[in-house]
């Protein structure tokens, strides 16, 4: 149902073109900021066609387009750009209001530029619209070309896929494991026999639910 999706790491990508056009005089800083403002507003008006069951879970039809930003490259250079500031600055627009899109995720490190850290703190206090993850932890597992794939889960951009299972029915899964893949209510064998061996009280003992 498209519960959440990655918007990738776009600040540095946009920044290359902004800098080129600023230097050539094609755009002004106001134009660059307006482009980012418009992107954020467009991300907020996207709506997915979803099942009624999904709509019953969440109000407001969020889709959590996660925009990853900041952090460091493996070569030690910060990945904070002018557009990183522009993105946060968009959140100061009075008419924008709170919203889950874009789901801005800052790859945090104490060594990030001081001005950027202070700006993040100010915007966080004013809007509660930013989440933070450890840049060090992400780079140690997925490298510096990583982004949040879902709401909070990192992956290598363009190289990995993530299957979203945050709403798995744990109680049902446990019953399947106990019953060898047979549905308790319908009697249907939903998992091929032999894939999961059912629990046998005489051999495995009684399940202690405590």
Predicted regions and their residues:
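Conserved catalytic cores of very large enzyme subunits
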Residues: 1-210
């Amino acid at each position: 149902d498209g519960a959440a999706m990655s918007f990738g790491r776009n600040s540095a990508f946009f920044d290359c073109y902004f800098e080129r056009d600023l230097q050539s005089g094609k755009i002004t800083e106001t134009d660059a900021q307006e482009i980012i403002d418009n992107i954020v507003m467009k991300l907020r008006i996207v709506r997915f066609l979803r099942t009624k069951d999904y709509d019953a879970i969440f109000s407001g039809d969020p889709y959590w387009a996660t925009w990853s930003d900041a952090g460091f490259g493996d070569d030690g250079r910060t990945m904070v750009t002018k557009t990183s500031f522009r993105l946060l600055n968009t959140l100061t627009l009075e008419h924008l209001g709170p919203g889950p899109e874009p789901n801005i995720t800052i790859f945090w490190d104490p060594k990030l530029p001081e001005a950027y850290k202070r700006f993040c703190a100010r915007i966080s206090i004013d809007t509660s619209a930013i989440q933070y993850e450890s840049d060090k932890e992400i780079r140690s597992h997925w490298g510096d070309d990583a982004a949040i794939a879902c709401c909070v889960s990192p992956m290598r951009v363009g190289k990995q896929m993530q299957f979203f299972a945050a709403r798995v029915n744990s109680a049902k899964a446990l019953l399947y494991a106990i019953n060898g893949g047979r549905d308790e209510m319908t009697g249907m064998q939903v998992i091929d026999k032999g894939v999961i061996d059912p629990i046998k009280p005489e051999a495995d003992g009684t399940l202690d639910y405590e």
